[in-house]
Amino acid sequence: MGTILDKIVDQKKKEVAALYETYTPVKEKRKTRSLVKALEQFTVIAEVKRASPSKGDINLHVDVRKQVKTYEGCGAGAVSVLTDGQFFKGSFYDLQTAREESSIPLLCKDFIIDKIQIDRAYEAGADIILLIVAALTKEKLKELYSYVLEKGLEAIVEVHDEKELEIAIQLNPHVIGINNRNLKTFEVDLSQTEKLGKRLNEEKLLWISESGIHSKEDIICVKRAGAKGVLVGEALMTSSSIHTFFEDCKVNI
C-alpha cells in the first residue's frame, strides 16, 4: 500500500499524460513578480486552499477573488494557490482568477513532475513554482529547476528532512521551503523548522517555513529559527479574522 504522496504522484502522471493530449503551451513571454524581493522583509505567503487529504473540505466554496483581495489588503507578500483538483479541489482556473485580482507574486502550489505543468502554471499567471524534493528524483528536480529558470520564474524547493535538504542545497535555489508536514503521512512537526533552519542559516540561504503555523507563538518560533517568511493556508482559510493573523506576524523577536 503506497503513501499519500505515492497516490498523488500516480495521479499527476495521469494528468500529465492528459495535458500532452489536450494542451499546447503558449510561447509568448510576460513580466513576472519576484518572491525573493518580497522576502527582503518577513513575508506571509497566503494560500487559497479549498481542501486537503488530511483535513477534508476546508473552505470548499471560497470566493477566490475576495480571498486574494483580503490577503493583499492585509499585507501578504505573495499568494499561493493550490491547483491540484483530485486531492485539494483546486484548479488552474483558481490560479488564473488570483492572477487577475492580485499584483503580488503568485505561487503555483502543486505536485510538479513535468515541464508541461510549469508551462500551464506560467500561462495561468504563476511567478513561482513549487518543486517538492520528495516527489522527484535528483535528476528530474535539476531538470525542472533549470526549466523554471528558463521560463523566467522563481522556485521554492521544498524539503522535509536532512536528506532532502542536502539535495536542495546543491541547487542553490531561489528559496527553500521547510515543510513541517511529512507528505508520506501528512503528520505535522513544527520542530522541523528549527532543525533544518540551522543548516540553512549556516549556508546563508533564503528560506521559509510551511505548514502547521496557526498562532502568534508559531510565528515567533519560526522567526527565531531564521525563516524569512511563512506559507500559511488552513489557518487563514478558516480564520474569522485574517487581519489579526497578519498583525500577529508583525511581532518583533
From Swiss-Prot:
It holds the Pfam family IGPS. Keywords: Amino-acid biosynthesis, Aromatic amino acid biosynthesis, Decarboxylase, Lyase, Tryptophan biosynthesis. Signal peptide: none annotated. It is an enzyme of class 4 (lyase). Its EC number is 4.1.1.48. GO terms for molecular function: indole-3-glycerol-phosphate synthase activity; phosphoribosylanthranilate isomerase activity. The keyword Cytoplasm does not apply. This is Indole-3-glycerol phosphate synthase.
